[in-house]
Amino acid sequence: MILKSFLLGNPVSLCMNIINSVVMVGLYYGFLTTFSIGPSYLFLLRARVLEEGEEGTEKKVSATTGFIAGQLMMFISIYYAPLHLALGRPHTITVLALPYLLFHFFWNNHKHFFDYGSTTRNSMRNLSIQCVFLNNLIFQLFNHFILPSSMLARLVNIYMFRCNNKMLFVTSSFVGWLIGHIFFMKWVELVLVWIQQNNSIRSNKYIRSNKYLVSELRNSMARIFSILLFITCVYYLGRIPSPIVTKKFKETSETEERGEGEEETDVEIETTFETKGTRQEQEGSTEEDPSLFSEEKEDPDKIDEREEIRVNEKEKTRDEFNFQETFYKDSQVYKTSYMDRNKNKENSKLEIFKLKEDPFFLWFEKPLVTLLFDYKRWNRPLRYIKNNHFENAVRNEVSQYFFYICRNNGKERISFTYPPSLSTFLKMIERKISLLTKEKLPSDELYDHWIYTNDQKKNNLSKKFRNQMETVNKESITLDVFEKRTRLCNDENKKKYLPKIYDPFLNGPGRGRVKFFFSSQILNKMSIKNYIETGWINKIHSILFTTDQEKLEEKIDTFDKNSLSTEKKLSLFPFPETEQGRIHSEDQIKILKIFFNAVITEPKTKRIKKKSIGIKEISTKVPSWSYKLINDLEQQEGENEEMVAEDHEIRSRKTKHVLIFTDNDENTDANSKNTNNLDEADEVTFIRYSQQSDFRRDIIKGSMRAQRRKTVICELFQANVHSPLFLDRIGKPLFSFDISGMIKFILKKWMYKKTTELRISDYTQEKKKENEKKKEEDKREEYKRQEKARIEIAQTWDRVLFAQAIRGSLLVTQSFLRKYILFPSVIIAKNIARILLFQFPEWSEDLKDWNREMHVKCTYNGVQLSETEFPKNWLTDGIQIKILFPFYIKPWHRSKVPPRQKDRLRNKEQKNDFCFLTVWGMETEVPFGSPRKQRSFFEPIFKELRKKIIKLQKNPFLVIQVLKERINLFLNLSKERKKSVMKTILFLKGIIKELSKRNPIQLFGLRKIDELSETKKEKNGVISNGMINESSIQIRFMDLTDSSLTEKKMKDLDDRTSTIRNQIEKITKDNKKGFLTPEININISSNKISYPTKLLASIKNIWQKLKKFKRINVRLIRKSYSFFKFLIERIYINILICIINSPRITTQLFFDNSTKMIDKYIYNNETNKEKIAKTNKNTIRFIWTKKKSISDISKKNSKILLSSFSQAYVFYQLYQTQFCNLYKLRYVLQYHGTSFFLKNEIKDYFETQGIFYPELKHKNILNSEMIQWKNWLRGHYQYDLSPIRWYRLVPHKWRNRFNQTRLVQNKDLNKRHSDEKDRLILINYKKLNDFELNSLSNSKYNLQKYYGYDLFSYKSINYENKKDSHIYVSPLRLNNKQEISYNYNKIYKKGKLINMPGGIIPINLEDDDILNLXKFTDRKYLDWRIFDFCLRNKVNIESWIDIDTNGNKNTKTGFNNYQIIDKMDQKGIFFLKICQNGGIMASNKKKDLFDWMAMNEEILSRPISNLNLWFFPEFVILYNTYIMKPWIIPIQLLLLNFYENVSENKNITRKNKRDLFLFSNEKKSIELENRNQEEKESAIRDNLESDAQNQANLGSLFSNQEKDIGEDYASSDMKKRRKKKEYKSNTEVELYFFLKRYLRIQLRWDDSLNQRMINNIKIYCLLLRLINPREIAISSIQRGEMSLDILITQKDLTLTELMKKGILIIEPIRLSIKNDGQLIMYQSLNISLFHKSKPKINQIYREKSYVAKINLDKSIARHPKMAENRYKNDYDLLFVPEKVLSTKRRRELRIRICFNSRKRNGIHKNPVFCNNVKNWGEFLDKRKHFEKKKLIKLKFFLWPNYRLEDLSCMNRYWFDTNNGGRFTMIRIHMYPRLQIC
């Protein structure tokens, strides 16, 4: 081929052929395999790097040879299967690696051990070379991969499957690996040579300082390599459990081993092993994909378990059904018992015959490798999936996804659904019969033959179908028209058939009664005795309840229907034990007959099956596991049973049972031989969950832990692991730094420091109170912080491995040391010291205190037990030691204490008379708290010594102390001060001498003046000093808030300055007058001024300066406050402006850019561009608009997720905003994909506003030539899946919030239909009611399921008009051509458009879809449409369609009254209205509490909620309102109107029925209503027959016409139940049903009582264990630990009284049930029938010839009374066209039509249909060129191109392949939404 291309001269073709050749691909894959570097390279590198010399060269060669040989063996193992099986199993690693590693470890570390005994050097050298060779060979076979993973090596295996010339591929891939390996080794050598020759590395100072670094590295390299190898292998082997340590399961029944190569019975359930040693991550998954377990599927070790059951002395085989519904620990396991005809209770036990096998022979039968190593994880599975049908788990069968050649469409093709057993059988035949010659027909001949046979069969079926449809058109609708199904005959002579429920031909392999049990994990341990299991037995729904969970026993199934269903089930009547014994089987049968006769009827007739049917010889082999695993809870529940396992094997969440009270009842019979009961005691325990990650959930003990991939734990304590891919989805940012918050915090701290320095005398009382409050808050915060720290410490002790054992041992040791060693030795030492100090010893007092100390053992939570009793499992669960009346050593004991001091000491001791012991022997107030300061022994001694020393110091040393003070004062004066004083003294003395010499007469006067001046000076000095001292008080900056205080202070300063000023003026005047003496003449010459006058002048000058300085000082003091205030304000303003400017600049830039982008985006529309530019180009006035923005933000609730609002609600809010604001959404609304998701009315409204392009209003689908199946899939994107299912698929939680549409009321939204404001369009919505589905029969269940499949196929018709793709029934042509819509409510009423959301109910949710409350994270409740809390069991209304066949456009209703016409007597086509419950007469309802957005309309249009008898009738409207709109109405509002008398209308319409629990006055009113109703119904019939035009009151009339079908059902049930148990009041009955049916609430204590109640319980537990509890009780009451006010002294307190008193509070339990993938797959098909996110308004386009309207009306008229026979199978009257054919013929006809034999791709394309497809959003016009018959044709097709998932999706339905892969159904809805242009 290559040569031919070369000769042709086509270089491109030549290159492509070379690239795609096997050799090149092998080289490529081999080269890639080089990069899967493993530990084997360590040996190779070690030999090449370290070895030197001649021996080193040989070792290098041997290492390289061994390495290449090992890799060659790995490549050969790909081609050679036995070698691959030998090397690709985990036991190979275990067998080879562990001994070899041990040997290699000793070899490297103890070489001298092997050197002894060696004779010659040569032999050892050769041995070492051989060891090097073996090292590299063996380690290459170990298949370890470090970098990056083994995936590159597995690519070879993938291509090997596709390659034809496999040997050439293996050779070329090995050559490619060899080339890559040589490149890698050369690269390593180059790096080493570069390191050796690099001077910068060699000249490094660290390397130069150590001369022998290289030699030391060489010497220790061997040890380094051995350590690396050891760590690597331990890392890989650490995930593999040792086969010796693991425990074999205890088998419940032995198994038969058949066939070749059958190995061990104890093998795993699910295998996560993959080739090449790595394991698939399965630990966190809840469902395992069967496609991953391809190796398990062909397991030769399968166990075909056949349990033999003896009934009436005959051996019967169990009939187990291969229908898996996996629940993880959610289903309880019960025993099965069967009854013989003699009803003998002794013979009713289940007898399992075990094959007796000698274990000794069994040992030799099994191979050694299998005994030691199970190649699928030994004897332990990873998860244990329990089947709900059977006791033991059913093994997964072989996957149907098996590739093999088969004939398809007349040609040989590879089928991926080929049965593997068939292909294996064919290969065996080909090997055995080698002489058999197979004649292969040519492909054309095969194809022609297939075409011929297909056309023949298609014509026959079409002819038959046409004949039957003609019969239907001739108004002869009889049951004979329908093709009969093949039924299983029970009795050939009498021709009795099995009931439909048990007919294997009708129900397939999944027949039988499926029980459903609530999750036992979530239930509280305290209420386990009151736990009620609900069983669905036949058609009895929520009637039979178990009353005592603890006393479950083997009971007898007396139902007639157990002929084929022998599965394990819940016993119906585990009655509590009475004095006479348990109820006998005859009594049970009588009670069962009552229920059986009242309720169970056959689907077609009213005849009751009463004759018992024996167990027949019908059996199927179901491979199941021989062992039964249980978890911890199941083990505790089944401890009284005989067959319980010794220990639980399934790991559950880590729990600790906190023991509270043990009741030891020793009142046993002394003569009884059974002494085991003496040790048994009733224990009351709390369950405490460990606060740690629950990564071990449901893992089997000893199983291999799968390696977690793509998970990172970033924090020290992290609750959940996070993948790095989804770190951006975490709401909390990793790093957050609030700059403004930090600045505020610093400023507050600084201001607080400044203000605390100011001490003002007149501090107000209000400030004191505020400070006290602040201190209390700080204390509270500190307490919370300490509590949090304590919890963290406790959790840390709980997390660390073996930490509790170490801590407990230390605590016990510390307690012993403290009590018996430390304190006795301290007492002895103290008293000896007292004797030596000649004082009396205090032995008796100390020993009394020592004996008073009690060491009470407590649980980990602090619940007190006793001194000697240790908590259960205290080494693992933890322990606390509480010390009561702790002993403190005292230096002396006071003989007499004053009474006041005694009381004070007693109060102090009561506060500190207990503590907890820490690990270090310290004392703490609370467990894990901080250690408290202990009393010191020497402190009182030192205190007494100090007192005595003070007394001694007082008298003799007083004089010395005074002298010391004087000396210090004198010494403190500075030298300069001394000098200045001395100078002034000498100067004054000189002046006096001079004056006395010159003028002795003036001496007296001058002395007088001097004295006067001195005295004045002294006065001035005193005044001035006082003034300065007063004025120099440091006045600190005051708080800005203390304005009154600052004003008062300023006033004081003003007064002070004024007085100082007056005093200064006085002094100056006195000084001037002092020198004027009239008696003495002083002759002073005019030329000379005497010296004293100069001195006085200078002193006066200085004094004036001082005065000026004083004024300045006073002014500064006065203005300091305003100055500081101005300074701080300036700082604040600068900081604020800085903070504001930065976001303002960025936001301005952002808005500028955004406006440019918007302008660029909508450049086509000039007007829009101008408007947006005007609105968006304004600069931001940040500060001025600040208040407005804050007010806007405060109006919104930040917690509300916008995604939880519906589309209608969002547009309703947009409509209420200003007109200009809508332009902000213009670019969103003008996006070309938006038009598909907007309602037409909203589009019209936006078009009138000018913000929606008219050309975007209706988009065309251009892909009309695409395959029809693909186009259909595009219309069904991921929003279709039900909300409950999407919550199970975690990544799509937001889709549920998107789909939760709300009720919206908008006045003028629809302007297009403004002329039709008075028109009321009746559209019914589909009701969500999961629980009620259980009451329907199994036949209806199966019928609905198959209808869902049929209609699912019909949806592919008219695929390109998505409106018409949702017409899943055959609509009728009505008289007035009225529009019909399904699943959605649109009510046009007085200009209002109310979009009532239509719920989507999955068809087969009935058996196991309890609402998963825990998954609804964004809501606090369940949707109100799902449950109705009423006693009357309403019939399941899956879906109904109201067709007002006689409706008139002129029908009007008043807008004041809610008159909804949604219950019509006419029946729908496909989903009939099974029952019509009585509705509330809304027209008479006057008072409403609130009506938010017409919410009550939907409430009133629902079926009745039985308001007259409900749990709390006051809450009915409030409850419904709240659970619908939780974000609007706070939860507190539900309790505000508790005592308000809500006037609820009791006028509930009924027909010929009475409620069981109605009072007499209500019954009379109902009778009157029934009379009125008959008159109204007759009027309605007249109106309908005459088709009158004037029907103004049609709404109110029809609302009164509703019937309550389920009432008979409920009343009959209630009568029987009241016979069983009499109740005191209606409330008790309601509470009973409310609790027992729904089990969705729990009672908890009030929050305020929680802590006090726990404290009381702790004290009770201690007092119950004490012999004399009086002292402890009194001390605990004094300490306040035991609260007397919450002690319940009244004995007979009921739950109601407790709830009235507020002690108990009702709150919901979050139930969680995991459904298997099979259910989700069915849902993904069924749910596609409905489309919740978009309303479908469908026009009628099929005509009368399809199904005659008259015939339908007649058929409806024949069955007007649905109440007479509730289980009447009306689905036989539903005209899906294929209904006339049987299921198999129907399926065959579809496939024949799909195979258009002359089309190449096998898909039928109708040119007429494809060319006339209408646009999206338009109704189908009935035009003339459309032929009606062609529209009616069935255009089904099967095989899509290039989509494996689609094929497997439809494969489950077309071919009844029930074991399909779970992933295929879901993936269809997980595709991203395709943009349809």
Curated annotation (Swiss-Prot):
Kindly list the places in or outside the cell where this protein is found, as annotated in its UniProt entry. Answer: Plastid, Chloroplast inner membrane
- Composition-biased stretches, type Basic and acidic residues, lie in 249-258, 299-308
**Gene Ontology biological process terms, A to Z:** protein transport
- Pfam families reported in the protein's UniProt record: Ycf1 (PF05758)
Q: Cite the InterPro entries for this sequence.
A: TIC214 (IPR008896)
In this chain, the stretch annotated as Disordered covers 249-308
Q: Subunit structure, per the record?
A: Part of the Tic complex.
- What family does the entry list? Belongs to the TIC214 family.
Q: What is this protein called?
A: Protein TIC 214
Tell me the gene name: TIC214
